[in-house]
Amino acid sequence: LVPLAASVELLHTATLIHDDVIDAAPERRGRPTAAALFNNASSVMLGDYMFAHAAEFVARTGNIRVIRNFADTLRVMANGELTQDMSAFEYSEDVQRYFDRIAGKTASLFATAAEGGAIVCGAPERYVGPMRRYGEQLGMAFQIVDDILDFSATSEELGKPAGSDLLSGTVTLPALLYMGRSPADRSEERRVG
């Protein structure tokens, strides 16, 4: 179980390092990002190094199903990040597309962690699917809360610049719900982008 947990943590950290480069984030959790301390190229290589280490740890589980799920999760997360980047400042996004996007990013990692834990621990098959769904729902909830905090908390509370999602053109659930309640204001939001 420990190699799986280490692989998930390394994968998560690698994605955060890459996210900070993409977002040009100066800090995370109140501390300078790797890109701020070094440079973008070194940060990308550090993230890649962590991806490779994560793959090494997941391989130590010796479970081909867990290894395949891990590889699929990496692909799904990369696709989610690409989708988010390609839809920046696209204010026509709807709530379902938002849910699809966060399912492909945060929720897929939580789902793989929960499912992989069940598999590696030898849980009966009837529990594996429910554990995956639990992880996915937990990941969705985590991302929604994170998006709400980006919209409502201060930079000091977040440890990073508040409102960074909106500034980078990432349309999150709070923005979608606001635009849904105030359709007349949608033209104003479109002009922001």
Question: Could you tell me what each predicted segment is?
Answer:
Residues 1-185:
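Mg2+-dependent prenyl diphosphate-binding active-site environment of isoprenoid biosynthetic enzymes
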